[in-house]
Each structure stands twice: as C-alpha cells, then as structure tokens.
Curated annotation (Swiss-Prot):
Keywords associated with the record: Periplasm, Signal
Name this protein carries in UniProt: Glucans biosynthesis protein G
Organism name: Shewanella sp. (strain ANA-3)
Gene Ontology annotations of biological process type: beta-glucan biosynthetic process
SUPFAM superfamilies per UniProt: E set domains, Galactose mutarotase-like
Pathway the protein acts in: Glycan metabolism; osmoregulated periplasmic glucan (OPG) biosynthesis
GO molecular function, one term: catalytic activity
C-alpha cells in the first residue's frame, strides 16, 4: 500500500506510487460507455527528452537566491522561472544545524511561531502572516519576501520570531536558515480574531479554509507522473513573494516560484476569504522536458470508508473521509457525480472532456451523525471546486484512488490532464478559480445525489449480487410525476430497478441490483429522466471485487 502521509501540512517528496500494477482506466460519459483504456505505459509513442542530469549545489552557507531585495512587478517571477528553466535542474543544498535536521515530530511541534511577531500585526491590516520553522521532515529552505509599492524585501530568518518549549534543549540558530513555509491569518470567523486562512508548506502543497471549516483536503501547484510505476515527481515552491494587503481590501496576493527536474513555473494566487474562500490562480509553466504525464489544478484528499464501501472496516464511526465524491460539470452540459472509494487495488479513472466547466473533490455529507468523531469533525472539512478560466481544450479529469487502511494517509488525487503533451522549451499558461468551503458550488433548481449505499442483495444468504441505493435531493419544488430511471453497466446484469419518492430527503430513492457474473470491474451509470427539462446529476460508480 502506498499513499501520501498526512502529518500537519507535511507531504513527503518520496514517490507516491512506486511499482503497483495499474487497473484499467474506464469512465462512463454521455449516453455511451467510454472505451476501456490502460494507463500510459512507460514507453511513449514518440521519443521524449530526459530531464537534464541534476547538479548538486555545494553545501555551504545559506544564501538568498530568489527573493533578493529590489524592484518587483507582476512579471518578475515569470522572468525568474523562464531563466531557471533554461538551465539544468539544480539540487539545492541548504544544510541545517545537525540538531534541527534530526528533530523528532514532538520536538519540531514544540517550535512555534510567536503570534506577537506576526507580520503586519501592529498595522491593523485585514491579514497577518506567520512562518514555519525548518526541521523534521521540512528540510527544504523556502525563501519569502514582502512586496510593498513595487519593492520586494527579503524576509530573513529571526530566532526571536519563534518560541521553543521544554522539549527543545538547544538554542535556535542566529544565521538566516530560511523557513519551511508560512500561513496567512484573517478575521475569517470572528471580528478581532485572526484565524488561519491558508497554509503553504511542503513541496507545492497548500490548503485553505472557508468560514467555519477545519483543514481537510489539500491542493498542489502541479502534479507530475501521478500513479506512474517509475514514481511520482513532486515539484516544490522554492520562493514566495507576498504582497502587503490594503487596509480596506479583502484580498491578499501571493506569488510563487515552482521548480522540479522537469519544469519551472510562475504562480500568482489572489486570495479572497469568505464563506467560500476564493483563490484565483494564474500559472505559467516552462518545461525542461516534454510533459506527457502532467496534472493541472491537482487536489489531494482522504477517503477511508462510508456507507457505499466499508470493506469490513472495524470502526465505530459510520464514515471517515475528507471528501466523499468527485463532481464534474463537463463541456457537454452534464453534471456528473462519482462517489469515492477505498479500493483493494489501485484504481485510475479518466473522464474525457472538451472545455470542462468545473470539477472538484466535494465533502457533501455535512451531518455530524454520519461521522460521530468528536475530534476530527469531518463534517467541517471544506470542499474544493475548480473552475477553469478560458478554454482548457481536450483532455480528461483524472481520479486516482489508492488503497489505505488508515485515515492518516491521503489516498485520493484528482486533476485535469491535457490531451496533448506540453512541449519542452514552451511557455504554457493556464488559469483557474478555486472555491474552498462548505457549499462551493452554487445551488440551482437541480437534482443532486445526496447519498450512495451498497450491500449484499440477499440478507438471508450469501450472494455475489449487490444492492445499490442512490438517494437524490431536489433543490426546489418536487414535480407531480416520478422520473424515469435508466441504469447501465459495462458488464454483469442489472435488475430490479425501482424509483420512489423520498419525502425525508425532498427527493427520490433509486434502487437496483447488480449481478457481477465473472467480472472483476464494472462501470455503472444511472440517470433520472424528467418530462420537463431539469438539471439532474448523472451518477457514476466503479464496482470492483
């Protein structure tokens, strides 16, 4: 079993997949089944240039490489990324004092930023910023600069910014050892109280919150070679430039420089907190090599179990997950809902599309009773909705589901994969809007899937037949007539299809049985048809042994 370790904001730079055998990628779209495909093999159809051999930076005193004090404008990071990509990738070596490099988890956790030292704390601005110390798993030096009036000022490390508890027995260094990341605070929930709003720490990972949320799923700047047998490549944000916010603005802007063996990139994040915190992302990539296994706007989440697949989980909690489904608005006007699963084997699904309108990992179940966890409060985890800006063309929303036996592991990944590789030496620009919150997708007079459950079809005796129950919620008045239910499968036999009103849910309940026969993997698709036009989510599901 391979997965992403969940430790605060930590995401390791080791391989995600290693050498697990990939399952067939098979997704249902429109009125027909998608052709069954296999994930791309290691040998590409056309020759691909290998990344330049990385060179090691001498292990000497840490130096300011990117965030040097000086003039800064909207094109500064783009120029840096372009210059960086024109040279071979360099493995940066920024040694920590031995004591910090070998910190345990408890020791690292004992080094805390002193809120009194928060950036802009004494200026009465709507945002404040705090930095993370280096150490434990967070060994990389991340440079940070503050931008004001088109001037960037390098933010040097200061030991006075931090407090060390009783676990730490050594003095913090006086040299500029940099930081491992930072977090932004805002009066998100209560006037006068600066709560966490957003965190950048670990590779290109970041997280954000809407009002009333607790941290859950994460986003990344870029995904490379996810679910690849040779291992995943994790780009890193090497430097950040944070613009000083205005007194009367609900906006803070963060610029970031991304780097990895295959690509360099420039990112601009425009962050607006609220019930649903919106982040407008503008990015320009400069590939060193052809990017054929690239994921744009990637999200990473956790799904352990729910009513539609517990896999004999011995857990007092009915459901455990940060997200329970993948929602997609495709270019054909369809709204697709794909419940997540914790499979027994690695699963990769690709949902082909042209000009996607939106997609995201959603936490739809908001009832505490569904989780019964007084500490984790999964009902408060944010959903993340991605809206492409402009036409993203042909490609696919890719969903990766990784087996896991513990909630400490992130095992769900989603992103957009362009159909055509991004050529080496090119400049690739894309933009999108992220919405983090409890209800990031605007409600309409539509019918949405509210619950998916499955179990043995015959409660009296063992049987391979499976019973599926799909509940739909109607936003608005319920029509007099029942919709027609259409259920399709890529294999096996569908029987006993029943649709009924569900007054408890202001909607409908669809039930049907599946006889798998000799199949080990079956794609399912269910639609409700009304006599009058109405936006109805199409339910998709992958059944596996």
């Amino acid at each position: 079993m391979v997965s992403l370790l969940r430790c605060q904001s930590f995401k390791p730079s080791s391989s995600l997949i290693c050498s697990l055998a990939l399952s067939a990628a098979f997704a249902l779209s429109s009125s027909a089944f998608a052709e069954e495909t296999k994930p791309a093999e290691n040998k590409p159809a056309t020759p691909v240039v290998s990344p330049p051999k990385a060179t090691a930076q001498p292990a000497n005193k840490n130096q300011v490489r990117f965030t040097k004090t000086g003039t800064f404008d909207g094109d500064s990071v783009v120029k840096l990324a372009r210059k960086l990509a024109s040279k071979p990738y360099v493995v940066l070596k920024d040694p920590l004092p031995a004591g910090l490099a070998k910190l345990t988890y408890d020791e690292y956790r004992d080094i805390r930023f002193n809120p009194i030292s928060s950036i802009w704390r004494d200026q009465g601005l709507p945002f404040q910023m705090q930095m993370f110390h280096r150490g434990f798993y967070f060994q990389d030096l991340i440079e940070i600069a503050i931008v004001e009036a088109n001037q960037a000022t390098h933010l040097a490390y200061e030991p006075k910014y931090f407090t060390a508890g009783e676990v730490i027995t050594q003095a913090l260094p006086n040299d500029d050892i940099g930081y491992s990341g930072f977090r932004i605070h805002n009066q998100l929930n209560t006037n006068g109280v600066y709560d966490e709003l957003m965190v950048f720490q670990g590779a290109s990972y970041f997280r954000a919150l809407g009002k009333g949320n607790s941290y859950g799923l994460s986003a990344r700047g870029l995904a490379l070679k996810t679910a690849d047998p040779e291992g995943e490549e994790f780009p890193i944000f090497r430097a950040f430039w944070v613009e000083r916010p205005s007194y009367d603005s609900n906006l803070i802007v963060v610029h970031a420089l991304l780097d990895s063996p295959s690509v360099a990139g420039a990112y601009r994040f425009s962050v607006r907190p609220g019930d649903n915190t919106q982040i407008d992302v503008e990015a320009t990539l400069f590939p060193r090599v052809e990017l054929s296994k690239v994921g744009l706007a990637p999200s990473t989440s956790m799904f352990l179990h729910s009513l539609n697949g517990r896999h004999d989980t011995d857990d007092f909690r009915p459901e455990v997950h940060d997200s329970d489904g993948l929602l997609m608005f495709n270019g054909r006007g369809e709204h697709l809902w794909r419940p997540l699963a914790n499979p027994r084997q690695l699963q990769v699904s690709a949902f082909s599309d042209n000009s996607p309108q939106g997609f995201g990992l959603i936490q739809r179940e908001r009832n505490y009773a569904s989780y019964q966890d007084l500490e984790a409060h999964y009902e408060r985890r944010p959903s993340l909705w991605i809206e492409p800006v402009g036409n993203w063309g042909q490609g696919a929303v890719v969903l990766t589901e990784i087996p896991t036996e513990s909630e400490i592991h992130d095992n769900i990944v989603s992103f957009w994969k362009p159909r055509q590789p991004i050529p080496a030496g090119s400049e690739y620009h894309f933009a999108y809007r992220m919405s983090w919150g409890e209800e990031p997708v605007a409600k309409t007079n539509s019918v949405v899937v509210s619950r998916t459950a499955s179990g043995r079809a015959d409660i009296a005796k063992a049987t391979p037949r499976r019973l599926f129950v799909v509940d739909y919620h109607l936003n608005g008045a319920m029509p007099d007539e029942l919709p027609l239910a259409k259920v399709e499968s890529s294999g096996g036999v569908i029987s006993n299809v029943v649709i009924a009103r569900n007054a408890a849910n202001n909607g409908y309940r669809l039930a049907f049985e599946l006889e798998p026969e000799d199949k080990e993997l079956i794609e399912l698709r269910a639609e409700l048809k009304f006599s009058t036009p109405r936006q109805v989510e199409t339910w998709l599901y992958r059944w596996t042994l």
